[in-house]
């Protein structure tokens, strides 16, 4: 799974609990994926292709090439 090169944001794991009437009938695994894009950014005067999350792109933490 891709991880943000700026803030190291990646996938999160947990459980999905299904409720049947008044008792818990089962738990299954779930993965929440971050909104990570492959973009060209400016690094040290050149361009480089990296995975960056959309929150870092929106906040202006990187400059697109």
Curated annotation (Swiss-Prot):
InterPro entries: Bacterial_rp_bL28, Ribosomal_bL28, Ribosomal_bL28/bL31-like_sf, Ribosomal_bL28_sf. GO terms for molecular function: structural constituent of ribosome. GO terms for biological process: translation. Gene3D superfamilies: Ribosomal protein L28/L24. It comes from the Bacteria. It holds the Pfam family Ribosomal_L28. Belongs to the bacterial ribosomal protein bL28 family. HAMAP family: Ribosomal_bL28. This is Large ribosomal subunit protein bL28. It comes from Lachnoclostridium phytofermentans (strain ATCC 700394 / DSM 18823 / ISDg).
């Amino acid at each position: 799974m891709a991880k943000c090169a700026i803030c190291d944001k990646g996938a999160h794991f947990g459980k999905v609990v299904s409720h049947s009437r008044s008792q818990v009938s089962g738990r299954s695994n779930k993965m929440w994926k971050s909104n990570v894009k492959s973009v060209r950014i400016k690094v040290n005067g050149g361009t480089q292709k990296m995975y960056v999350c959309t929150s870092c792109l929106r906040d202006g933490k990187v400059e697109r090439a």
